[in-house]
């Protein structure tokens, strides 16, 4: 118990020291809409998390059309958001999360922290936003020196914000978490968002890749991506193969199986009638855009499809669909019940996924697309 209390004291002392070093005040500063010239947004997580930023970034553009928006994120954000016009400047951050989690100075990473502080301070931000319940992001907002630093209340890190919103509804979708932050600056969000952008050249290259592999105009193109960031989010690859084999046997259907950078999904390339592809992130986006439907796990590709307006059949395991469902309403989310039960994703059957595919295709046919 004494050790735990000591760790808590050290953590609080470090947070206090960081806040003092940041030179920030916890009091909100009045910033009129017309005064806002530079905005910082922090999202240091995965591909899907960046895609779920689209509605927030869209509303930020509408509310502050003359402001420059800087996104502090991992390098994939720059690739994903290329061509959307939603971000004026990308700052890449690759600081190890473990160092930030512990706030232990013996683990290193402090030189990177101060380098980042200099980068952010030099931009003189008026507003800064983040919506993680994570001390790392609170520290970054404090280090930015932004006049208004907006996020959610989270333990001792609250002192680093000028506007700390109560978390409130625990069932809220991640998109709504972001949009709710705009209430602090009197912005009223709507349901319209800018989609991910694929250039004409990228689209033409994707079409040619498919044409060379026998895909014709009028074919129903079904993509399958069996990868995911965590093992507990991955439906067994052999069941994806069963789905692929069934769909590939149907007249007028072309199945395209994508392998992820780690090679997950490469086994599907051996399924008779399946087109197997390994791609870059931008190539994957262009190919998904040409699909009628993407079958996948709760993963980055699922969110990419949602960000492109492509319907999905997504298998959920440890993730919670009501928090992390893809953008849009053209999706079938398949799970075996409680995400808390061990082996939940393994209980999802091949038949249930095929039924979801048939429902999605029926809706597409009824809509004429």
Where are these predicted regions, by residue range?
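Catalytic machinery of carbohydrate-active enzymes
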Residues: 1-369
């Amino acid at each position: 118990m004494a050790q735990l209390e000591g760790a808590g004291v050290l953590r609080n002392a470090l947070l206090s020291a960081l806040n003092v070093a940041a030179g920030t005040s916890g009091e909100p500063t009045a910033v009129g809409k017309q005064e806002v010239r530079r905005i910082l947004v922090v999202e240091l997580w995965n591909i899907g998390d960046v895609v779920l930023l689209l509605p927030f970034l869209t509303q930020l553009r509408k509310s502050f059309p003359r402001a420059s928006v800087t996104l502090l994120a991992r390098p994939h954000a720059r690739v994903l958001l290329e061509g959307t016009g939603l971000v004026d400047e990308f700052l890449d951050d690759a600081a190890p999360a473990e160092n930030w989690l512990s706030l232990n100075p013996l683990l290193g990473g402090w030189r990177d922290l101060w380098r980042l502080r200099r980068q952010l301070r030099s931009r003189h931000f008026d507003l800064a936003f983040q919506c993680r319940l994570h001390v790392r992001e609170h520290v970054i907002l404090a280090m930015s020196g932004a006049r208004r630093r907006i996020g959610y209340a989270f333990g001792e890190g609250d002192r680093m914000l000028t506007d700390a919103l109560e978390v409130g509804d625990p069932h809220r979708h991640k998109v709504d978490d972001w949009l709710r932050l705009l209430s602090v600056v009197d912005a009223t969000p709507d349901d319209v968002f800018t989609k991910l952008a694929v250039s004409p050249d990228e689209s033409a290259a994707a079409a040619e890749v498919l044409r060379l592999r026998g895909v014709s105009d009028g074919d129903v193109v079904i993509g399958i991506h069996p990868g995911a960031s965590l093992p507990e989010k991955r439906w067994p690859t052999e069941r994806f193969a069963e789905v692929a084999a069934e769909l590939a046997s149907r007249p007028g259907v072309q199945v395209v199986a994508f392998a992820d950078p780690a090679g997950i999904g490469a086994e599907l390339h051996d399924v008779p009638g399946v087109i197997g592809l390994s791609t870059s992130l931008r190539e994957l986006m262009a190919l998904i855009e040409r699909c009628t439907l993407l079958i996948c796990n709760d993963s980055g590709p699922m969110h990419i499809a949602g960000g492109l307006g492509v319907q999905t059949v997504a298998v959920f395991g440890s993730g919670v669909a009501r928090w992390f469902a893809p953008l849009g309403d053209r999706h079938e989310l398949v799970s075996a019940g409680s995400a808390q039960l061990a082996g939940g994703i393994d209980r999802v059957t091949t038949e249930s996924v095929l039924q979801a595919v048939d429902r999605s295709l029926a809706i597409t046919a009824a809509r004429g697309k």
